[in-house]
Amino acid sequence: MTVLNRTDTLVDELTADITNTPLGYGGVDGDERWAAEIRRLAHLRGATVLAHNYQLPAIQDVADHVGDSLALSRVAAEAPEDTIVFCGVHFMAETAKILSPHKTVLIPDQRAGCSLADSITPDELRAWKDEHPGAVVVSYVNTTAAVKALTDICCTSSNAVDVVASIDPDREVLFCPDQFLGAHVRRVTGRKNLHVWAGECHVHAGINGDELADQARAHPDAELFVHPECGCATSALYLAGEGAFPAERVKILSTGGMLEAAHTTRARQVLVATEVGMLHQLRRAAPEVDFRAVNDRASCKYMKMITPAALLRCLVEGADEVHVDPGIAASGRRSVQRMIEIGHPGGGE
Protein backbone atom coordinates (compact mmCIF):
# COMPACT_ATOMS: atom_id res chain seq x y z
CA MET A 1 0.00 0.00 0.00
CA THR A 2 1.21 3.50 -0.83
CA VAL A 3 2.26 5.59 2.17
CA LEU A 4 2.14 9.31 1.51
CA ASN A 5 4.64 11.85 2.76
CA ARG A 6 3.04 13.50 5.79
CA THR A 7 5.42 16.49 5.57
CA ASP A 8 3.26 18.03 2.83
CA THR A 9 2.35 21.50 4.18
CA LEU A 10 -1.20 21.64 2.83
CA VAL A 11 -1.96 18.10 3.99
CA ASP A 12 -0.70 18.97 7.47
CA GLU A 13 -2.77 22.14 7.51
CA LEU A 14 -5.98 20.38 6.50
CA THR A 15 -5.57 17.29 8.66
CA ALA A 16 -4.67 19.34 11.75
CA ASP A 17 -8.33 20.33 12.10
CA ILE A 18 -9.79 16.82 11.84
CA THR A 19 -11.90 15.79 14.81
CA ASN A 20 -13.10 12.29 15.63
CA THR A 21 -16.38 11.64 17.45
CA PRO A 22 -18.77 8.66 17.57
CA LEU A 23 -20.75 10.43 14.83
CA GLY A 24 -17.76 10.52 12.49
CA TYR A 25 -14.84 12.68 11.43
CA GLY A 26 -15.31 16.44 11.19
CA GLY A 27 -13.46 19.73 11.14
CA VAL A 28 -12.86 19.99 7.38
CA ASP A 29 -15.00 21.90 4.89
CA GLY A 30 -15.72 20.36 1.52
CA ASP A 31 -14.56 23.45 -0.36
CA GLU A 32 -12.60 23.88 -3.60
CA ARG A 33 -9.23 23.70 -1.87
CA TRP A 34 -10.24 20.45 -0.19
CA ALA A 35 -11.55 19.03 -3.49
CA ALA A 36 -8.30 19.86 -5.29
CA GLU A 37 -6.31 18.18 -2.53
CA ILE A 38 -8.53 15.07 -2.65
CA ARG A 39 -7.93 14.73 -6.38
CA ARG A 40 -4.18 15.22 -5.93
CA LEU A 41 -3.95 12.66 -3.15
CA ALA A 42 -6.04 10.14 -5.08
CA HIS A 43 -3.68 10.51 -8.03
CA LEU A 44 -0.62 10.04 -5.80
CA ARG A 45 -2.13 6.95 -4.22
CA GLY A 46 -3.19 5.51 -7.57
CA ALA A 47 -6.78 5.40 -6.38
CA THR A 48 -10.19 5.87 -7.94
CA VAL A 49 -12.86 7.46 -5.74
CA LEU A 50 -16.38 6.02 -5.92
CA ALA A 51 -19.41 7.67 -4.29
CA HIS A 52 -22.88 6.29 -3.72
CA ASN A 53 -25.93 8.31 -4.75
CA TYR A 54 -26.81 8.94 -1.09
CA GLN A 55 -23.50 10.61 -0.22
CA LEU A 56 -23.09 14.28 0.69
CA PRO A 57 -23.05 16.54 -2.39
CA ALA A 58 -19.40 17.50 -1.82
CA ILE A 59 -18.40 13.82 -1.80
CA GLN A 60 -20.42 13.09 -4.95
CA ASP A 61 -18.90 16.07 -6.74
CA VAL A 62 -15.28 15.11 -6.02
CA ALA A 63 -15.71 11.42 -6.88
CA ASP A 64 -14.53 9.87 -10.12
CA HIS A 65 -17.74 7.85 -10.37
CA VAL A 66 -21.17 8.18 -8.72
CA GLY A 67 -23.87 5.51 -8.74
CA ASP A 68 -25.53 2.66 -6.86
CA SER A 69 -23.52 0.03 -5.01
CA LEU A 70 -23.55 -2.71 -7.65
CA ALA A 71 -22.72 -0.36 -10.52
CA LEU A 72 -19.85 1.08 -8.49
CA SER A 73 -18.56 -2.38 -7.60
CA ARG A 74 -18.46 -3.19 -11.30
CA VAL A 75 -16.56 0.06 -11.93
CA ALA A 76 -14.14 -0.96 -9.17
CA ALA A 77 -13.51 -4.32 -10.84
CA GLU A 78 -12.89 -2.73 -14.25
CA ALA A 79 -10.91 0.32 -13.12
CA PRO A 80 -7.18 0.34 -13.94
CA GLU A 81 -6.33 1.68 -10.47
CA ASP A 82 -5.20 -0.80 -7.82
CA THR A 83 -6.80 1.13 -4.95
CA ILE A 84 -10.54 1.73 -4.62
CA VAL A 85 -11.88 4.35 -2.22
CA PHE A 86 -15.55 3.50 -1.70
CA CYS A 87 -17.61 6.36 -0.28
CA GLY A 88 -20.62 4.45 0.96
CA VAL A 89 -21.57 2.11 3.78
CA HIS A 90 -19.58 -0.95 4.78
CA PHE A 91 -21.45 -3.69 2.92
CA MET A 92 -20.92 -1.75 -0.32
CA ALA A 93 -17.16 -1.68 0.16
CA GLU A 94 -17.31 -5.40 0.98
CA THR A 95 -19.10 -6.07 -2.31
CA ALA A 96 -16.40 -4.15 -4.16
CA LYS A 97 -13.77 -6.27 -2.42
CA ILE A 98 -15.65 -9.47 -3.32
CA LEU A 99 -15.61 -8.50 -7.00
CA SER A 100 -12.05 -7.11 -6.84
CA PRO A 101 -10.22 -9.47 -4.45
CA HIS A 102 -6.75 -8.44 -5.58
CA LYS A 103 -7.31 -4.71 -5.15
CA THR A 104 -6.97 -2.57 -2.04
CA VAL A 105 -10.43 -1.33 -1.04
CA LEU A 106 -10.69 1.55 1.42
CA ILE A 107 -13.75 3.03 3.13
CA PRO A 108 -13.31 6.51 4.64
CA ASP A 109 -15.00 5.47 7.90
CA GLN A 110 -15.42 1.78 8.72
CA ARG A 111 -18.11 2.68 11.27
CA ALA A 112 -20.53 3.51 8.44
CA GLY A 113 -22.90 0.58 8.82
CA CYS A 114 -26.36 -0.17 7.43
CA SER A 115 -29.55 -0.92 9.34
CA LEU A 116 -30.86 -3.07 6.47
CA ALA A 117 -27.71 -5.16 6.11
CA ASP A 118 -27.62 -5.57 9.89
CA SER A 119 -31.24 -6.79 10.00
CA ILE A 120 -30.19 -10.38 9.24
CA THR A 121 -27.10 -12.16 10.55
CA PRO A 122 -25.44 -15.29 9.15
CA ASP A 123 -26.68 -17.32 12.14
CA GLU A 124 -30.25 -16.10 11.59
CA LEU A 125 -30.08 -17.01 7.92
CA ARG A 126 -28.70 -20.48 8.72
CA ALA A 127 -31.56 -21.08 11.16
CA TRP A 128 -34.11 -19.87 8.60
CA LYS A 129 -32.65 -22.20 5.98
CA ASP A 130 -32.90 -25.10 8.44
CA GLU A 131 -36.63 -24.36 8.81
CA HIS A 132 -37.07 -24.56 5.03
CA PRO A 133 -34.76 -27.30 3.69
CA GLY A 134 -34.36 -27.15 -0.06
CA ALA A 135 -35.49 -23.54 -0.33
CA VAL A 136 -33.63 -21.13 -2.60
CA VAL A 137 -32.15 -18.14 -0.78
CA VAL A 138 -32.44 -14.84 -2.63
CA SER A 139 -30.63 -11.97 -0.92
CA TYR A 140 -30.73 -8.31 -1.81
CA VAL A 141 -27.26 -6.91 -2.56
CA ASN A 142 -27.73 -4.76 0.57
CA THR A 143 -26.35 -7.54 2.76
CA THR A 144 -23.04 -8.36 4.41
CA ALA A 145 -20.44 -10.54 2.72
CA ALA A 146 -21.14 -13.32 5.23
CA VAL A 147 -24.84 -13.36 4.30
CA LYS A 148 -24.03 -13.30 0.57
CA ALA A 149 -21.85 -16.37 1.17
CA LEU A 150 -24.94 -18.27 2.41
CA THR A 151 -27.05 -17.04 -0.50
CA ASP A 152 -27.96 -18.90 -3.69
CA ILE A 153 -28.69 -15.82 -5.83
CA CYS A 154 -28.32 -12.13 -5.07
CA CYS A 155 -30.68 -9.57 -6.54
CA THR A 156 -31.07 -5.85 -6.97
CA SER A 157 -34.25 -3.83 -6.73
CA SER A 158 -34.20 -3.68 -10.54
CA ASN A 159 -34.08 -7.43 -11.14
CA ALA A 160 -35.55 -8.95 -7.96
CA VAL A 161 -38.74 -9.91 -9.82
CA ASP A 162 -36.75 -11.54 -12.66
CA VAL A 163 -34.52 -13.42 -10.22
CA VAL A 164 -37.47 -14.88 -8.30
CA ALA A 165 -39.34 -15.65 -11.54
CA SER A 166 -36.32 -17.65 -12.77
CA ILE A 167 -36.62 -20.12 -9.89
CA ASP A 168 -38.60 -23.37 -10.23
CA PRO A 169 -42.15 -22.41 -9.15
CA ASP A 170 -42.40 -25.54 -6.99
CA ARG A 171 -39.41 -24.57 -4.84
CA GLU A 172 -39.74 -22.39 -1.79
CA VAL A 173 -37.91 -19.07 -1.86
CA LEU A 174 -36.44 -17.29 1.15
CA PHE A 175 -36.15 -13.58 0.37
CA CYS A 176 -34.06 -11.34 2.61
CA PRO A 177 -33.59 -8.95 4.18
CA ASP A 178 -35.97 -6.16 3.02
CA GLN A 179 -39.63 -6.81 3.76
CA PHE A 180 -40.90 -4.01 1.52
CA LEU A 181 -38.92 -5.11 -1.53
CA GLY A 182 -39.99 -8.68 -0.76
CA ALA A 183 -43.64 -7.61 -0.61
CA HIS A 184 -43.21 -5.86 -3.97
CA VAL A 185 -41.76 -9.04 -5.51
CA ARG A 186 -44.55 -11.19 -4.07
CA ARG A 187 -47.17 -8.76 -5.36
CA VAL A 188 -45.75 -8.70 -8.89
CA THR A 189 -44.97 -12.42 -9.20
CA GLY A 190 -48.02 -13.67 -7.30
CA ARG A 191 -45.76 -16.31 -5.78
CA LYS A 192 -47.30 -18.00 -2.72
CA ASN A 193 -44.20 -19.91 -1.62
CA LEU A 194 -42.08 -16.78 -1.20
CA HIS A 195 -41.10 -16.24 2.43
CA VAL A 196 -39.96 -12.72 3.29
CA TRP A 197 -37.59 -11.73 6.10
CA ALA A 198 -38.87 -8.88 8.30
CA GLY A 199 -35.93 -6.51 7.79
CA GLU A 200 -35.95 -2.91 6.70
CA CYS A 201 -33.90 0.17 5.95
CA HIS A 202 -34.78 2.55 8.77
CA VAL A 203 -34.65 5.53 6.41
CA HIS A 204 -36.90 4.10 3.71
CA ALA A 205 -39.27 2.52 6.22
CA GLY A 206 -39.72 5.96 7.75
CA ILE A 207 -41.15 7.41 4.52
CA ASN A 208 -44.75 6.56 5.27
CA GLY A 209 -47.96 6.37 3.29
CA ASP A 210 -49.63 9.33 4.99
CA GLU A 211 -46.76 11.63 4.00
CA LEU A 212 -46.89 10.34 0.45
CA ALA A 213 -50.66 10.83 0.22
CA ASP A 214 -50.40 14.37 1.61
CA GLN A 215 -47.66 15.29 -0.86
CA ALA A 216 -49.57 13.73 -3.77
CA ARG A 217 -52.67 15.76 -2.90
CA ALA A 218 -50.61 18.94 -2.57
CA HIS A 219 -48.89 18.37 -5.94
CA PRO A 220 -51.51 16.70 -8.17
CA ASP A 221 -49.56 17.25 -11.39
CA ALA A 222 -46.31 15.71 -10.14
CA GLU A 223 -44.87 12.30 -10.91
CA LEU A 224 -43.96 9.95 -8.06
CA PHE A 225 -40.58 8.21 -7.98
CA VAL A 226 -40.82 5.64 -5.17
CA HIS A 227 -38.04 3.30 -4.09
CA PRO A 228 -39.30 -0.25 -3.42
CA GLU A 229 -37.57 -0.29 -0.01
CA CYS A 230 -40.01 2.42 1.12
CA GLY A 231 -42.77 1.70 3.57
CA CYS A 232 -44.96 3.86 1.34
CA ALA A 233 -44.54 1.79 -1.85
CA THR A 234 -47.80 -0.07 -1.22
CA SER A 235 -49.54 3.24 -0.51
CA ALA A 236 -48.31 4.61 -3.83
CA LEU A 237 -49.83 1.68 -5.71
CA TYR A 238 -53.02 2.02 -3.66
CA LEU A 239 -53.32 5.70 -4.63
CA ALA A 240 -52.98 4.70 -8.27
CA GLY A 241 -55.39 1.78 -7.94
CA GLU A 242 -58.06 3.92 -6.31
CA GLY A 243 -57.72 6.61 -8.95
CA ALA A 244 -56.49 9.15 -6.40
CA PHE A 245 -53.36 9.60 -8.50
CA PRO A 246 -52.89 8.69 -12.18
CA ALA A 247 -51.31 5.23 -12.40
CA GLU A 248 -48.96 6.27 -15.22
CA ARG A 249 -47.36 8.84 -12.91
CA VAL A 250 -46.56 6.36 -10.13
CA LYS A 251 -43.18 4.73 -10.72
CA ILE A 252 -41.56 2.16 -8.39
CA LEU A 253 -37.87 2.53 -9.22
CA SER A 254 -34.37 1.71 -8.05
CA THR A 255 -31.96 4.63 -7.74
CA GLY A 256 -30.58 3.77 -11.17
CA GLY A 257 -34.11 3.63 -12.53
CA MET A 258 -34.83 7.04 -11.06
CA LEU A 259 -31.88 8.55 -12.91
CA GLU A 260 -32.99 6.98 -16.18
CA ALA A 261 -36.54 8.26 -15.65
CA ALA A 262 -35.24 11.74 -14.81
CA HIS A 263 -33.73 12.00 -18.29
CA THR A 264 -37.03 11.19 -20.00
CA THR A 265 -39.75 12.59 -17.75
CA ARG A 266 -42.03 15.26 -19.15
CA ALA A 267 -43.24 16.24 -15.70
CA ARG A 268 -42.29 19.64 -14.38
CA GLN A 269 -42.31 18.35 -10.81
CA VAL A 270 -41.35 14.97 -9.33
CA LEU A 271 -41.90 13.78 -5.77
CA VAL A 272 -39.08 11.47 -4.70
CA ALA A 273 -39.43 8.81 -2.01
CA THR A 274 -35.91 7.70 -1.15
CA GLU A 275 -32.88 8.96 0.79
CA VAL A 276 -32.46 12.70 0.21
CA GLY A 277 -28.91 12.40 -1.15
CA MET A 278 -30.45 11.11 -4.38
CA LEU A 279 -31.87 14.56 -5.12
CA HIS A 280 -28.38 15.85 -5.97
CA GLN A 281 -27.94 13.46 -8.89
CA LEU A 282 -31.54 13.85 -10.08
CA ARG A 283 -31.23 17.63 -10.17
CA ARG A 284 -27.99 17.37 -12.12
CA ALA A 285 -29.60 14.95 -14.57
CA ALA A 286 -32.64 17.17 -15.22
CA PRO A 287 -32.09 20.70 -13.87
CA GLU A 288 -35.32 21.92 -15.43
CA VAL A 289 -37.41 19.55 -13.27
CA ASP A 290 -38.43 20.40 -9.71
CA PHE A 291 -37.44 17.31 -7.70
CA ARG A 292 -38.82 17.31 -4.15
CA ALA A 293 -38.39 14.84 -1.31
CA VAL A 294 -41.55 13.20 -0.02
CA ASN A 295 -39.84 13.29 3.38
CA ASP A 296 -36.98 15.79 3.62
CA ARG A 297 -35.86 14.16 6.89
CA ALA A 298 -35.06 10.88 5.11
CA SER A 299 -31.30 11.17 5.58
CA CYS A 300 -29.09 8.17 6.36
CA LYS A 301 -26.75 8.98 9.24
CA TYR A 302 -24.41 6.19 8.14
CA MET A 303 -24.07 7.50 4.59
CA LYS A 304 -23.40 10.94 5.99
CA MET A 305 -20.51 9.60 8.10
CA ILE A 306 -18.44 9.77 4.92
CA THR A 307 -17.49 13.40 5.45
CA PRO A 308 -14.87 15.60 3.77
CA ALA A 309 -12.66 14.98 6.81
CA ALA A 310 -13.12 11.21 6.58
CA LEU A 311 -12.23 11.12 2.89
CA LEU A 312 -9.15 13.29 3.46
CA ARG A 313 -7.96 11.07 6.32
CA CYS A 314 -8.59 7.99 4.18
CA LEU A 315 -6.38 9.20 1.36
CA VAL A 316 -3.62 10.47 3.65
CA GLU A 317 -3.44 7.40 5.91
CA GLY A 318 -4.70 4.64 3.62
CA ALA A 319 -7.48 3.90 6.09
CA ASP A 320 -9.81 2.14 6.62
CA GLU A 321 -8.96 -0.95 4.57
CA VAL A 322 -11.73 -3.49 3.96
CA HIS A 323 -10.92 -7.18 4.31
CA VAL A 324 -13.15 -10.14 3.40
CA ASP A 325 -12.23 -13.72 4.25
CA PRO A 326 -11.24 -15.43 0.96
CA GLY A 327 -13.66 -18.33 1.49
CA ILE A 328 -16.56 -16.00 2.23
CA ALA A 329 -15.60 -13.84 -0.72
CA ALA A 330 -15.56 -16.83 -3.09
CA SER A 331 -19.02 -18.00 -1.99
CA GLY A 332 -20.40 -14.47 -2.08
CA ARG A 333 -18.95 -13.92 -5.55
CA ARG A 334 -20.86 -16.95 -6.85
CA SER A 335 -24.19 -15.58 -5.63
CA VAL A 336 -23.51 -12.22 -7.28
CA GLN A 337 -22.38 -13.86 -10.53
CA ARG A 338 -25.57 -15.96 -10.66
CA MET A 339 -27.57 -12.76 -10.42
CA ILE A 340 -25.62 -11.17 -13.27
CA GLU A 341 -26.11 -14.29 -15.43
CA ILE A 342 -29.89 -13.98 -15.03
CA GLY A 343 -29.56 -10.46 -16.40
CA HIS A 344 -31.02 -7.00 -15.93
CA PRO A 345 -29.31 -6.27 -12.60
CA GLY A 346 -29.59 -2.56 -13.38
CA GLY A 347 -29.23 -0.45 -10.26
CA GLY A 348 -27.88 -2.00 -7.10
CA GLU A 349 -30.52 -0.35 -4.95
From Swiss-Prot:
Free-text cofactor note: Binds 1 [4Fe-4S] cluster per subunit.
EC number(s) stated in the UniProt entry for this protein: 2.5.1.72
Chief localization: cytoplasm
Residues binding iminosuccinate, per UniProt: 52, 69, 140-142, 157, 227-229, 255
Record keyword Transferase present: yes
Gene3D superfamilies according to UniProt: NadA-like
Recorded superkingdom: Bacteria
InterPro entries: NadA, NadA_sf, Quinolinate_synth_type2
GO cellular component entries: cytosol; peptidoglycan-based cell wall
Binding residues annotated for [4Fe-4S] cluster, in chain numbering: 114, 201, 300
Pathway(s) the chain acts in: Cofactor biosynthesis; NAD(+) biosynthesis; quinolinate from iminoaspartate: step 1/1
GO biological process, one term: 'de novo' NAD biosynthetic process from L-aspartate
One function term, GO molecular function aspect: metal ion binding
SUPFAM superfamilies: NadA-like
Family listed: Belongs to the quinolinate synthase family. Type 2 subfamily.
Entry function: Catalyzes the condensation of iminoaspartate with dihydroxyacetone phosphate to form quinolinate.
PANTHER family on file: QUINOLINATE SYNTHASE, CHLOROPLASTIC, QUINOLINATE SYNTHETASE A
Protein name per Swiss-Prot or TrEMBL: Quinolinate synthase
Organism of origin: Mycobacterium tuberculosis (strain ATCC 25618 / H37Rv)
